[in-house]
From Swiss-Prot:
Domain KH type-2, chain residue ranges per copy: 38-106
Entry protein name: Small ribosomal subunit protein uS3
Role played: Binds the lower part of the 30S subunit head. Binds mRNA in the 70S ribosome, positioning it for translation.
CDD domains, A to Z: KH-II_30S_S3 (cd02412)
Subunit structure: Part of the 30S ribosomal subunit. Forms a tight complex with proteins S10 and S14.
Keyword rRNA-binding: yes
Domain of life according to the entry: Bacteria
InterPro entries: KH_dom, KH_dom-like_a/b, KH_dom_type_2, KH_sf_prok-type, Ribosomal_S3_C_sf, Ribosomal_uS3_bac-typ, Ribosomal_uS3_C
UniProt organism field: Staphylococcus saprophyticus subsp. saprophyticus (strain ATCC 15305 / DSM 20229 / NCIMB 8711 / NCTC 7292 / S-41)
PANTHER family named in the record: 30S/40S RIBOSOMAL PROTEIN S3, SMALL RIBOSOMAL SUBUNIT PROTEIN US3C
Organism lineage string: Bacteria, Bacillati, Bacillota, Bacilli, Bacillales
Keywords (A to Z) from UniProt: Ribonucleoprotein, Ribosomal protein, RNA-binding, rRNA-binding
Pfam families with a match to the protein in the record: KH_2 (PF07650), Ribosomal_S3_C (PF00189)
Amino acid sequence: MGQKINPIGLRVGVIRDWEAKWYAEKDFASLLHEDLKIRKYIDNALQEASVSHVEIERAANRINIAIHTGKPGMVIGKGGSEIEKLRNKLNSLTNKKVHINVIEIKKVDLDAKLVAENIARQLENRASFRRVQKQAITRAMKIGAKGIKTQVSGRLGGADIARAEQYSEGTVPLHTLRADIGYAHAEADTTYGKLGVKVWIYRGEVLPTKNTSEGGK
């Protein structure tokens, strides 16, 4: 079933940790919805900042947010102006003290979400779906990926019948739990309708650690 399930969810508690690191006996639902509001606001506010994922930790009346991005300068802004605006907005949104930590992604071509979003943007600019997939694969393998698979589906090239085309290079062992596999999907809005983009990137094997194993229990 490794080819059906989300590769990230399958590995939580084995080699991956949770992106929401908190527990609540009461008000769990309201805190979960607050997390969703925070993530949605950050996605909308930082659409051009190449944000890969957001980690949220809670302690008493404080929220610690880690933003993983390929463009930290755009998130922080000149003299920290942009991150201060973001912090103030999240403070008012949650009525809690918010601390933001910006973490730079140094190899953006090995991050599945950033690769998928880049392919989607190029498709919206009417680039060839074959060319953009092959270019993404070449860049990822050149920078150190062990394997990569991409898939674009929909009315490709304006065809009347929707179909899916995928390209791959190297190996992507979806059944191996210790395999560090990034997965993401994105959508491209074209004149012929939406195109779906999926990306799997295999970055090598990771040995399970005690902390991540306990986090899955």
